Amino acid sequence: MEKLQRYFDAIEAELSKIEYAAEPDGLYAPVRYELSLGGKRVRPLLTLLACEMFAGDYRRALNAAVGLEVFHNFTLLHDDVMDKADVRRGKPTVHKVWDENTAILSGDAMEIIAFRYIARTEAPHTGAVVELFLKTALEICEGQQYDMEFERRDDVTEAEYIEMIRLKTAVLLGGALKIGAIIGGASETDADCIYRFGESLGLAFQLQDDWLDVYGDPARFGKKIGGDILNNKKTYMLINARQRVEGKDAEELSRWLSAAEYDPSEKIAAVTALYDR
């Protein structure tokens, strides 16, 4: 725990050192706000852990770790806009404090800041780290696109769902570990192994996150419960429910999924009850 705290403190210190232009404040204030919301800093911690696991000095991986954390928060900022989420980590989301256009543009700025930090990785690992980061970033966009497309489909399979969350969530945890391993001097085989471990960790994380969106405590979860239900997100629970429910339950679930107008709290309660059966 002492080592993790040292890593965490180092990450927070570097995040606090990010330099922003004085103007326009309307671009950079939302970035500072998003990063100030905190979080567990799981991805940068994994990067530093993986670096030291292969006998590297964790400080050599700090720039990459910070870049990954800024990038992760950029994805959350844009996700909140697309999902129309009002709360993130117990605080109003950027698009609620400002507006959607500001949130989109500030998110774009965060993506550029993230790449700037990734590109500061020291030789001889710069090229490999940048290439892996770009591959991961594009895969996350692919996963988000699948997620949006699945909202309009009723025939999403469990296999399609798993591939979607692999791209949307798991590849970033795998990438965080592999980037740290590369900087730490790991062999290609070892770096690939730790990447696969990170992917598995990411899949488990997303499955748990989907469950918490239905059954979690809002105070501990940090955002409103039921957002996935309101957006008809094809989570494992919804896919599984569609396979299990029959008769009137199946009709009720289909009615809620196709409803254009509804009371949000009523829909959340009704669909949750169907999940429980």
Regions found by a protein language model. Give the residues of each.
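Charged, compositionally biased N-terminal leader segments and the immediate start
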Residues: 1-2, 12
